[in-house]
């Protein structure tokens, strides 16, 4: 415990009410967040002579300050605790790591919000629902939502430039907010709120609201509106009945856990309508001395209760470990969902088999992760010996990708002692250079990456430059010109030149842009690590380049079709609601566009399928 922290005086001020506490170290950093039914009793337990674990002893030694937030109920405390954990990422808490590759459904915060598939960082304003186990699950959900609640799914660029409604409006899959007068803002906002409630699992609230509106319309003799609302109610009821009836059509999340060598894997099976929709393995950060019960309990809380995104909630949650706060967690999740969601730990029959499957997958994924980390660590030790550089903590690698100078993209990948840090991978769109000038591209990406202040833990020990002596020389020139507060001599710059015929194992490494390089034996573990990092950077750059190139080319794909000029291209995109709906459209649907004959529609259809 910090000498500056007076525990006796502090405990005299603490209430016996429920609440959340935040512990700070001498640097004013939050190191632990906890919740308690009785704050005074819980906090007093940290300052006894005999503590429960070494982890707690290490935590208490660093306490310099404790802040307390009182809540009305223990459920409120639980929700607040997980929001604080999400915000502060304390090092003594079990942390569920975000994986930005998981697909989500995004509901924008525009005047007329749109629904879309989303991956990556959540920068745009709006609501995020998920994550979903795969992209197909998202697309199926979006298709269902479009039938139930007709709000737009078109790109903003299409929405802003329409003068007449698209095909989606004509088949009653969109209310047509793009054209003034087709729908008032109040009705559109109601449909958006229904989507928000539906994706949050609050189906009964949606039905209640629709029934109330139908009855009101009927009393006011607006029978056409009442009939439309009746049809919408029936559609929602059909879906929800399929989701939550017992037997072979249940919605369950099944959570299996494996714990070994200080690392945990939690595997979640997503079962929808009685079928395994998909699954994901999660590897939370686990502080030393943490128990399995604490790992699983914290995971369940963070997974379902953190407020940064709205998770699609099942009808039931199965876990393979009895949790101390199971009832509190179930009550909190149920309150969030607006319906009862039980948490079961001793299922029978098919549920028991699901749980066994989740547990088996958790063990398999954990063993694979441990094996991978062991291999990477062995290779890293060899690399430290080869480079005569001890305690390498962070490595970064850069590569450039383009096609004949078109749409140049640079990539940066990051590795630590455990392997790839994919959440820190970055791509940079290169602009303002002569097409095909790889040296200028490397110059630009390095300045954008490093010409700024960096936290100590973000300074790489090694920077690999894929491209040989020329690119290495460019990198050294950039670092010689940088004027930053951190030590630009700390990163070791290492060039990687591909061997003859670009065969793996024949690479030449360079410390300097002049003179001879050196090679490592093809079976060298150090070389294998370098190849792994280089290949990750190469693949990341190529993927980014192809995505950027496809985006540019897709807009001109129509103009390459004989008979399609700029005017017809614009007409097609406006009428269909964008490029993707046009790609998905049938020949008959394309032929409905004014000025497009059946023969031309067939030509467009097959050209876009190539």
Swiss-Prot record:
Gene (name only): uvrC
Role summary: The UvrABC repair system catalyzes the recognition and processing of DNA lesions. UvrC both incises the 5' and 3' sides of the lesion. The N-terminal half is responsible for the 3' incision and the C-terminal half is responsible for the 5' incision.
GO-annotated biological processes: nucleotide-excision repair; SOS response
Keyword Lipid metabolism assigned: no
Domain named UVR: residues: 204-239
A Pfam match: HHH_5
Name of this chain's protein: UvrABC system protein C
Predominant localisation class: cytoplasm
Segments forming domain GIY-YIG: 16-94
Family: Belongs to the UvrC family.
Protein's organism: Edwardsiella ictaluri (strain 93-146)
Subunit annotation: Interacts with UvrB in an incision complex.
UniProt keyword terms in alphabetical order: Cytoplasm, DNA damage, DNA excision, DNA repair, Excision nuclease, SOS response
